[in-house]
C-alpha cells in the first residue's frame, strides 16, 4: 500500500501531558483524541493503545513516550504522553523537549504532589514555554472550596518556577467521565482545546536557520536502509540534501533520501515536526541516539565547556549533601546522557544544594553543541541540577 501524502493545511503545534503518576495523564490523552475526533475528525485512541509498550503494561506506568495526533478548530496537534513515574524522569527530559506547550495534569483529589513540582521544574529547564493546567477527577470532589484551594496552590507553584501562574488557564474536568461520553465533562475537553488554541502561541519556527535534528531513535528498514527519528529543532530538510551526523563518534556525511511524518511521505521536514529521515548508505551501527543530523559545517562536537548551573536543594528533590571538584554525574543533552567531570571556579571548594554556580565540564565523549544549549545534571536516577552552556572551550 503506498503511503498517503501528509496534507499541510492547519498550523502544526507540539504539546504533551505531564504530571504526577496516576493523576490521569494517559486517560486525558485518550479523552482528548476521543472528544475531538467526534467534532473535527481524526482518530480516537483508547487508553490501552496509548499506554501500549510491554514494560508499561507490566508495571501499570508509562515508560516510553507515546505520540498521538488530533485537530482542533484551528490547528493540528502532535501530542506526546510523557512518562510520569519518578524512575522514568530520564525519558521525561527527552519527551518534554518536544513541546511548544504542556498540559499539566493534577488530580483535584490529591492536589500538587512531588512529581507535579518536579515536572514543572523540568518543563522550565528543558525550555517548555507554556503550561496549561487540567485539574482532573473533579467529579470526585464536591467541595468548591477544595477545588479553589488546589487551583490556588497550582498558581503559586507555577509562579515559583517563573511561569505566569496568575494568568495560566486552569480547566476543571474529569477525563474518565469525558471518555464515558458525559456531555458536561466532554465540554471541559473542548474548553481545554480552546485553551490550547488561544493560550499557546503559534511558535516562531526557526525554519530559516540551518537544519538540525537531535536523533531519538534509529531503525533499519529492509530494502530501504537506515531511518533516524526525532523532532527537527531548526531549519528544513529536503529529500536529496547532503547532511552530517555529528556527536559522540567521528562526523560523517550522508544524504537524505526520504522524510516521513505519521507514516505519510513528505518532500521536506520543517522545524518543530517529528519526522523519520531515511539516510543513504548509512549502516545501522554508524548512528545512535544522542547524535544530531545537521546541515554540513554548521555545528561541531565539543566536550569541554563553561556552564552556568543551578543545583537543586533537597526540598526540590536534589542532593542532601554538597559535592566537590572531580564529581562525575551524568549530563543530559537533548536526547542523551553523557558522563562528565566538573571543575569549580577558583576559591570554590564545594557546591551546596541550592547553589547557583559557574562550572567547567569535561565530557567523556563530544556532543554537538552551541552556546546556549541547555542540559540537566543527573545522578542515580534523579535530577540534581540544571544548566546552560555559556562558553565552549574545545
From Swiss-Prot:
HAMAP family: EF_Tu_B. It comes from Blochmanniella pennsylvanica (strain BPEN). Mg(2+) binds at residue 26. GTP hydrolase that promotes the GTP-dependent binding of aminoacyl-tRNA to the A-site of ribosomes during protein biosynthesis. Residues 81-84 are annotated as: G3. This is Elongation factor Tu. GTP binds at residues 19-26, 81-85, 136-139. GO terms for cellular component: cytosol.
Amino acid at each position: 500500500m503506498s503511503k498517503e501524502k501528509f496534507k499541510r493545511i492547519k498550523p502544526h503545534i507540539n504539546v504533551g501531558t505531564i504530571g504526577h503518576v496516576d493523576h490521569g495523564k494517559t486517560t486525558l490523552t485518550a479523552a482528548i483524541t476521543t472528544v475531538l475526533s467526534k467534532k473535527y475528525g481524526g482518530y480516537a485512541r483508547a487508553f490501552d493503545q496509548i499506554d501500549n509498550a510491554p514494560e508499561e503494561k507490566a508495571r501499570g506506568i508509562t515508560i516510553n513516550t507515546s505520540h498521538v495526533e488530533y485537530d482542533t478548530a484551528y490547528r493540528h496537534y502532535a501530542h506526546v504522553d510523557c512518562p510520569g513515574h519518578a524512575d522514568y524522569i530520564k525519558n521525561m527530559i527527552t519527551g518534554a523537549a518536544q513541546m511548544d506547550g504542556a498540559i499539566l495534569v493534577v488530580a483535584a483529589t490529591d492536589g500538587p504532589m512531588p512529581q507535579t513540582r518536579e515536572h514543572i521544574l523540568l518543563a522550565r529547564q528543558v525550555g517548555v514555554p507554556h503550561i496549561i493546567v487540567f485539574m482532573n477527577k473533579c467529579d470526585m470532589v464536591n467541595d468548591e472550596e477544595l477545588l479553589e484551594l488546589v487551583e490556588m496552590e497550582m498558581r503559586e507553584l507555577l509562579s515559583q518556577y517563573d511561569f505566569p501562574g496568575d494568568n495560566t488557564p486552569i480547566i476543571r474536568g474529569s477525563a474518565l467521565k469525558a471518555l464515558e461520553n458525559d456531555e458536561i465533562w466532554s465540554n471541559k475537553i473542548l474548553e481545554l482545546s480552546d485553551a490550547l488554541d488561544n493560550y499557546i502561541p503559534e511558535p516562531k519556527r526557526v525554519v530559516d536557520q540551518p537544519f538540525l535534528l537531535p536523533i531519538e531513535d534509529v531503525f533499519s528498514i529492509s530494502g530501504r536502509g537506515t531511518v533516524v527519528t526525532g523532532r527537527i529543532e531548526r531549519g528544513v530538510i529536503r529529500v536529496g540534501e547532503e547532511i552530517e551526523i555529528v556527536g559522540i563518534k567521528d562526523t560523517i556525511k550522508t544524504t537524505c533520501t526520504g522524510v516521513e511524518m505519521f507514516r505519510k511521505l513528505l518532500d521536506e521536514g520543517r522545524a518543530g515536526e517529528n519526522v523519520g529521515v531515511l539516510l543513504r548508505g548509512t549502516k545501522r551501527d554508524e548512528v545512535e541516539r544522542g547524535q544530531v543530523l545537521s546541515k554540513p559545517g554548521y555545528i561541531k562536537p565539543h566536550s569541554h565547556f563553561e556552564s552556568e548551573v543551578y543545583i537543586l536543594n533537597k526540598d526540590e528533590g536534589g542532593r542532601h549533601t554538597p559535592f566537590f571538584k572531580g564529581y562525575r554525574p551524568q549530563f543530559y543533552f537533548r536526547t542523551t546522557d553523557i558522563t562528565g567531570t566538573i571543575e569549580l571556579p577558583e576559591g570554590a571548594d564545594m557546591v551546596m544544594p541550592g547553589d547557583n554556580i559557574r562550572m567547567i565540564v569535561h565530557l567523556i565523549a563530544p556532543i554537538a553543541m552551541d552556546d546556549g544549549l541547555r542540559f540537566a545534571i543527573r545522578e542515580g536516577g534523579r535530577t540534581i541540577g540544571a544548566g546552560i552552556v555559556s562558553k565552549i572551550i574545545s
